[in-house]
Curated annotation (Swiss-Prot):
Protein name, entry field: Bloodstream-specific protein 2
Active-site residue list: 378 (nucleophile), 381 (nucleophile)
Extent of Basic and acidic residues compositional bias: 467-480
Site (Contributes to redox potential value) location in chain: 379-380
PROSITE patterns: THIOREDOXIN_1, THIOREDOXIN_2
Length: 497
């Protein structure tokens, strides 16, 4: 009888918790998240400042009841196994589960309204059948971007491909599926994206999820739109080259270029996605390596981490911009590498200072490399510096390149090195892929990291310099002991006299 009562009480508690953030443990996790179509889970630790900032917004969102959706949280200090199961490496981490299975990580703003918007967008099917054209027209007024798949029925390849691809765009696009006869001006068996302001793009390529995903990533941004902190994430995932028009909105030349960007962006869409940024508000030119004496508007193309800069000796016009993009597409524009000057003496006490211009030389030297990416202003980097200097001296007489690079003043190829925080240390085996160092940044740990991955020579189990230091310490102790004895003997002699 008591057992039945406890079960009933637990179920009642669960029902009452539909408008709060449920506490999840390894014992109840799988069963609990399977109870709802959508379950948004926050992984946190109490000591994290960002977690503390998120907490009130999270609670406000959790207190609103949304059909078929629940919210929960995992304290990773008390539930380390759950944190490990989902490879939680930073806090807070928010993961969406759909029908009990991990679907995606939440990367939006951490406010109540944004969280609720995200949850609502993920409830129900990603693609809605449209029974008439007016339904789509109303959606175009309510949403910034609307996507319509024009197909005969829901069993076509277009329908199944769109349904799968749409899962990743629920927040940024509103999806419909409709019979072609409802849109007589459009080509049947195509996918049409409508953006506010009257812009439209059509996909009639292969019905493959990967190709359609690339199209949707591009088509949700305007032909020549402004990049802002709110939409930056949309541009950051585009695989096609992205061109940045850097403008000063109050200057005539910038106004003229900005007014032409929609037409230029539409014309050049197959080569490049064009955007503009107000450098008076967002001085991105500093990070892109644009010279301080550059004339504005300026233009920079970015592709696979490399920068391609339009001449900054003259202002960019519509004509020069179109010419530049076509030259770029033809492979006739060389990348502009942001780099500090090459130091006169590159290696001091075993540590090599690398700049962007010399990176490739060292990567192809035939040697293994241990490289530190740092920022001059970073406190953790300053604390780690003596340890890294000690490592450099330890391997000074070996074939290992122990190097450092100022990642704020030099171009870092993101396809080779993923640097998301400072300091970051990689071991690069000769001809191999970089391996990131993880763990406490102690001399012993870094030394063992090198010993584990080195390929061009053998590393002893114990560091040579540490052994020498211990030997030196013992000798110093012995010397001091002898000096003390000598002093005592001297005093005795004086007393005897």
């Amino acid at each position: 009888m008591r057992a039945i009562f406890l079960v009933a009480l637990a179920l009642a508690t669960m029902r009452e918790s539909t408008a709060e953030s449920l506490k999840l443990t390894k014992e109840n996790f799988n069963e609990t998240i399977a109870k709802s179509e959508i379950f948004l889970v926050k992984f946190y630790v109490d000591t994290c400042g960002y977690c503390q900032m998120l907490a009130p917004e999270w609670e406000k969102a959790a207190n609103e009841t949304i059909d078929n959706a629940l919210m929960g949280e995992v304290d990773c200090h008390s539930q380390p196994e759950l944190a490990a199961n989902f490879s939680i490496r930073g806090y807070p981490t928010i993961i969406l589960f759909r029908n009990g299975k991990e679907a995606e990580h939440y990367g939006g703003a951490r406010t109540k309204d944004d969280i609720i918007k995200y949850i609502k967008a993920n409830v129900g099917p990603a693609v809605t059948p449209a029974s008439n054209a007016e339904e789509v027209t109303r959606a175009k007024e309510e949403h910034d971007v609307v996507c319509v798949g024009l197909t005969a029925n829901n069993s076509t390849s277009l329908s199944t491909t769109l349904a799968e691809a749409a899962q990743s765009f629920r927040v940024s696009l509103k999806f419909f599926e409709a019979e072609p006869k409802l849109f007589p001006d459009e080509k049947p068996e195509t996918i049409v994206v409508y953006r506010k302001g009257g812009e439209k793009e059509v996909y009639d390529g292969p019905m493959e999820v990967e190709k359609l995903t690339e199209f949707l990533q591009i088509s949700r941004v305007a032909f020549g739109g402004e990049i802002t902190p709110e939409n930056y994430q949309y541009y950051s995932v585009i695989k096609r080259p992205v061109g940045w028009a850097m403008v000063k909105p109050n200057e005539t030349a910038s106004i003229e270029l900005k007014e032409s960007l929609t037409e230029v962006g539409k014309k050049m869409r197959s080569h490049m996605v064009v955007l503009w940024v107000n450098i008076s508000k967002h001085p991105v030119w500093r990070d892109f390596g644009v010279p301080e004496d550059a004339k504005y508007p300026a233009f920079l193309a970015i592709h696979w981490g490399a920068n391609y800069l339009h001449s900054t000796a003259e202002v960019v016009t519509r004509e020069s911009l179109e010419k530049f993009i076509l030259e770029f597409a033809a492979g006739r524009v060389e990348p502009t590498i942001k780099s500090l000057p090459v130091p006169e003496v590159e290696t001091v006490d075993g540590k090599t200072t690398i700049v962007a211009k010399t990176m490739q030389k060292h990567l192809t030297s035939g040697k293994d490399m241990l490289i530190l990416f740092f920022a001059p202003w970073c406190g953790h980097c300053k604390n780690f510096a003596p340890t890294f200097d000690k490592i450099a001296k330890e391997f000074d007489a070996t074939d290992l390149i122990v190097a450092e690079l100022d990642a704020t003043a030099n171009y870092v190829n993101s396809s080779t090195f993923t640097v998301t925080a400072f300091p970051t240390v990689f071991f690069v085996p000769n001809g191999g892929k970089p391996v990131v160092f993880e763990g406490e940044r102690s001399f012993e740990n870094v030394y063992e990291f090198v010993r584990k991955h080195v390929t061009t020579f053998k590393v002893s189990e114990k560091p040579a310099n540490v052994t020498e230091e211990k030997k030196s310490e013992e000798e110093n102790k012995s010397s001091k002991s002898n000096e003390s004895n000598d002093s005592n003997e001297s005093n005795v002699d004086k007393q005897d006299l």
